[in-house]
Amino acid sequence: MKVRATIICEQDRHVLLVRKQGGRWTLPGGKLERGESAADAAIRELWEETGLRVDELIYVLELETDGTRHHVFEVSVLNLEQLRPLNEITDCIWHPLDALHNLNISDAMRSIVSAYVRRL
């Protein structure tokens, strides 16, 4: 089973989404490196994909979908004004939490955001 750190960065009922060239919108995150904790992977992936530095990291939930275990974290960041797509990421957007049904996102991401919204 693949293990992934998935990040929810929410501001004013909008969630940060990223996209690779030609890909679907998704929450920032990625696979854990050997010996890396899920929390450390979340911090690293957010920085590598968006340039954002984590101020606070809260473990929200664990969800298994399609052979992947997602460790989901909510973050607050120190440098929101420095948001930009980096490395393999070509786009970043803030999208309303209540309008994700309008986007091309995976069922896994939809499930994660739905579980997060139920906790609010």
Q: What does each model-found stretch correspond to?
A:
Residues 1-15:
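Conserved N-terminal beta-strand and adjoining loop/helix that marks the start
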Residues 8, 25, 93:
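Residues that recognize and position ribonucleotide moieties
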Residues 30, 44, 95-98, 103:
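Structural detector for helix-capping/boundary residues
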Residues 27-60:
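The catalytic Nudix box helix
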Residues 15-16, 25:
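Hydrophobic residues embedded in beta-strands of well-ordered beta-sheets
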